[in-house]
Amino acid sequence: MKVENFLAQKSINYDKIDRFLMFRMYEKYKKCFKNIPIIQLIGTNGKGSTGRYLTQLLENLNYKIGHYTSPHIFSFNERFYLDGKIANDEELDQAHIRLEEIFKQDLQKLSYFEYATFLAMILFQKCDFIVLEAGVGGEYDATSVFERRMNIFTRIGFDHVQILGNSLEDIARTKLKIMAPIALISDEQE
């Protein structure tokens, strides 16, 4: 699998990430991505279940949905839910080949999560809606580079303090800075 070979070279840690690389890469290549309505999920807890519930709701309304989540438990493929099922190896490899065509040498610059995020956007090009779960959440998250139709904020608590801030207020402020014109915010907060 081409994707596995590529990922074997990547660290899954956030320690050496250039917070602005994803924004620069998207600006450089955004013409290669379709403008599909995106619903972004942000929060400390509850993104996965909220995302899957929302995905199934939209699928029941006969929309074609791509759902990008992290982390995975058993297999990288679990991060990509398309047409009611987890993406298979062939689908991921085809998306990887397309990313190589677009990014060429720039592909190597991306972090594990940035790469996976762009891979999702290629994989979901024929969807009616895309549900993206933020990784680190907030203004510097790889999923925040794309224009979002809506944000859903689940419970916000203490996470990624080295990036988001040391207080709950700082963390919430960082996450809320990327709020789309339409947003739902969970009333159950820490």
Residue ranges of predicted features:
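Short functional linear segments
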Residues: M1-G43, T50, Q56-Y63, Y68, ...
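Glycine- and other small-residue-rich loops at beta-strand/loop junctions that grip anionic moieties
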Residues: G43, F113, I185-E188
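ATP-dependent carboxylate-amine ligase catalytic core
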Residues: Y26-N35, N60-F146, F158, Q162-L164, ...
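Short active-site-proximal "capping" loops at secondary-structure junctions
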Residues: N45-K47, H72-I73
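Acidic, Mg2+-coordinating active-site environments of NTP-dependent enzymes
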Residues: F129, E133, R149-E190
